[in-house]
Design a protein with these regions (language model features):
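Catalytic core of DAGKc-family lipid kinases
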Residues: 100-138
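Short, structured patches in soluble enzyme cores that scaffold and shape functional sites
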Residues: 12, 95, 133-135
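Solvent-exposed alpha-helices and their adjacent loops that cap or buttress functional pockets
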Residues: 1-3, 59-62, 84, 121-123, ...
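Flexible, glycine/proline-enriched loop segments at strand-loop-helix junctions
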Residues: 12-17, 97-103
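Short, glycine/charged-enriched secondary-structure capping and boundary segments
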Residues: 25-26, 82-85, 104-107
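N-terminal glycine-/serine-/threonine-rich phosphate-binding loop
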Residues: 2-70, 75-77, 81
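Gly/Ser-rich helix-loop-strand patches that form or flank binding pockets
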Residues: 78, 83-96, 100
Length: 138
C-alpha cells in the first residue's frame, strides 16, 4: 500500500473506562501495526503500548504526518489544543458517546484508515475558539 501518511502520531484518551474500549483500541492498533507505516506516541501520553516509538514533544510534532485521536470529542479537542501551532492534520476515531467531531466509528476504522492512508481524503480546516472571563480561561 502506498501511503500519503507514513509517520502516524497516536493520541489516546487518558482513561479508556471499560474493557470493550480497550479491546477495540488494541484491535485498531494491531491493524495499524500491520501496515507499512510508523507509529509514534508523544512522551506526555500515559499509554506506553509496545507498538509505538515514544518521542519527546518537539520530535513528535516534527516527525508525524497526521495524528489519529482515539477517544471522544473532548479528546479530539485536547489534541487540537496541544497541536494547534503545528499544522498537523488530526483524524478522530469515536470511542465516546457523541461523536460530532470524532465521526469515524470503531466499526469503520479499518476501511476508513486505509482510504485515508492511500490519499482518499479531504482535509477540513476548523476553528478553535477560546474565551476568557475575568482572569479565568474558559
Amino acid at each position: 500500500m502506498r501511503a500519503m501518511f507514513k509517520e502516524i502520531g497516536i493520541f489516546i484518551k487518558e482513561d479508556l473506562s471499560n474493557s470493550i474500549d480497550n479491546e477495540a483500541l488494541n484491535s485498531m492498533i494491531n491493524s495499524l501495526s500491520n501496515l507499512d507505516i510508523s507509529l509514534y506516541l508523544d512522551e506526555s501520553s500515559n499509554n506506553k503500548n509496545k507498538n509505538f516509538t515514544i518521542l519527546n514533544h518537539e520530535e513528535y510534532v516534527k516527525k508525524v504526518d497526521i495524528v489519529i485521536v482515539f477517544g471522544g470529542d473532548g479528546t479530539l479537542l485536547n489534541a487540537a489544543r496541544k497541536y494547534l501551532n503545528y499544522e498537523i492534520p488530526i483524524l478522530g476515531i469515536n470511542m465516546g458517546n457523541v461523536g460530532f467531531l470524532t465521526d469515524i466509528s470503531t466499526e469503520n476504522f479499518e476501511k476508513t484508515i486505509k482510504e485515508v492512508l492511500e490519499g482518499s481524503h479531504k482535509i477540513e480546516e476548523r476553528n478553535l475558539v477560546s474565551a476568557k472571563f475575568g482572569n479565568n480561561n474558559l
